[in-house]
A protein has these predicted regions:
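Conserved P-loop small GTPase signature centered on TRAFAC-class small GTPases
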Residues: 1-24, 28-33, 51-58, 112-204
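Conserved Walker B
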Residues: 67, 92-93, 127
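Short, solvent-exposed loop/turn segments at secondary-structure junctions
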Residues: 70, 96, 130-131
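Generic structural signal for well-ordered alpha-helices
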Residues: 102-106
Length: 204
C-alpha cells in the first residue's frame, strides 16, 4: 500500500443517533473488532483510526463514536466540529430513534454550516431484527431523499462488510468533493459561490 497521504488526510467521521441503535458495534465491526452482543451504551465519545487507499493515495480517517443519551447532546455538538462525514443512525426496531433523526441532522447543520462542505448519510441498523421492524425501509429512504443524502440498511451483527463498503463510498465521495487540491480549494469554491452584496450607489 502506498504511504503517500492524500489531500484531506485525517478525515473525521462521526456517528450520531440515540442510545442503543448500535453505533459502537458498527464501528467495531468496520474496524476489525468483535461485535459485542451485550454492548453497554456509550457514555463518552471515542474514536478509532483507520486508512483507505484510493487513486494510489492513502487517506487516514477517524471514526468517532458518540453517546446518544439526551444528557450528552451538548457534548456531541462539540465533537461534531471538524467532521467531514456525518452518519445518523437509527435502529429499525426502534421508532423513537428514527423520529429523532431530524434532531441529529439539524445539529450537524447547526455546527457545520454549509452542507456542501461535508458528506451526510442515514443508516438503518439492525436489519437482522426484521421480525421486530417498527420503521419500514421506505420511511428511512424518504427521509434521506428529503435531505438529499445517502441511505443504507445494514446490520452490525450480520452485514459488517456491507457497512464497511458503504463507509468507504462515503469517504470516496468526500475525497471527490474536495478534489485534488484539498480542503482549501473547496473553501475557495464555496466563497466564490456566495453572491457579492451590491454596492450602494453614491450620488453627488
Amino acid at each position: 500500500m502506498s504511504e503517500k497521504s492524500g489531500n484531506g488526510n485525517n478525515i473525521k467521521i462521526i456517528l450520531l443517533g440515540e442510545s442503543g441503535v448500535g453505533k459502537t458495534n458498527l464501528i467495531n465491526v468496520s474496524t476489525g473488532r468483535n461485535f459485542e452482543q451485550n454492548s453497554i451504551s456509550s457514555n463518552q465519545s471515542s474514536f478509532f483510526e483507520e486508512s483507505l487507499e484510493y487513486n494510489n493515495k492513502k487517506y487516514i480517517y477517524n471514526l468517532w463514536d458518540t453517546a446518544g443519551q439526551e444528557i450528552y447532546r451538548s457534548l456531541n455538538k462539540i465533537f461534531l466540529k471538524g467532521s467531514k462525514i456525518v452518519i445518523c443512525v437509527y435502529a429499525i426496531d426502534n421508532r423513537p430513534s428514527f423520529q429523532e433523526l431530524e434532531y441529529w441532522i439539524n445539529s450537524a447543520k447547526e455546527i457545520l454550516g454549509d452542507e456542501d462542505q461535508y458528506i451526510r448519510a442515514i443508516v438503518a441498523n439492525k436489519s437482522d431484527l426484521f421480525e421486530e421492524q417498527a420503521v419500514p425501509d421506505n420511511e428511512g429512504r424518504q427521509l434521506a431523499e428529503k435531505h438529499k443524502i445517502k441511505f443504507c440498511v445494514t446490520s452490525a451483527l450480520c452485514d459488517a462488510e456491507g457497512f464497511k463498503k458503504f463507509l468507504h463510498e462515503l469517504i470516496i465521495d468526500y475525497i471527490n468533493l474536495i478534489g485534488p487540491e484539498g480542503e482549501n480549494a473547496l473553501n475557495f469554491k464555496l466563497c466564490e459561490k456566495k453572491p457579492e452584496k451590491e454596492k450602494k450607489k453614491k450620488f453627488c
